[in-house]
Amino acid sequence: DLYSRKIVAWEVHGQECGELAAELIKRAVLAEGIGRNHRPLVLHADNGAPMRSATLLETLRQLGVKPSHSRPRVSNDNAFVESAFRTCKYRPEYPADGFETIDVARQWVWRFVQWYNTEHRHSGLKFVTPQQRHRNEAPAIMRRRVVVYEQARARQPRRWSKGIRDWSLPSSVWLNPMKTASPELAQAA
């Protein structure tokens, strides 16, 4: 989930195929209680064969999910997912020599997803967990942080050269936000 960074679905298989991807998406929609009123709903993916397969695209159509794919040779089109993969691979317990079996890999990924969603205080989310953001608990947490910071500043004003930290989170998140034209460009048009 781009908004919360929560890993809403995952699986480990010995091969990639559109059928497995379609089943994963169906289970994710069911598990997250996503109905047709949750719109717009977009699945952004790389350009791999499973993500472009007719089976997956038809499943997305049936679920009312719009497919989106990374642009060729644009390295940051899937930056949020790449960041999550980096977090995964840099965990101290990540096996340097690979997993012994697929079952061991599945167990490891399950533990990682639990940690990532419920314990990992994400820097891009101002140090709330993806689960807290997903459950809309972040606004209350941010309000409490503002109070704590304001109290600390009131007790020791000389330690604060500026205002308190900005604890606000954006209300919407975009993979590739539209750039607004500068006034000069708007006038030139």
What does each of the following model-derived ranges do?
Residues 1-189:
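Charged DNA-binding/catalytic regions of mobile-element recombinases
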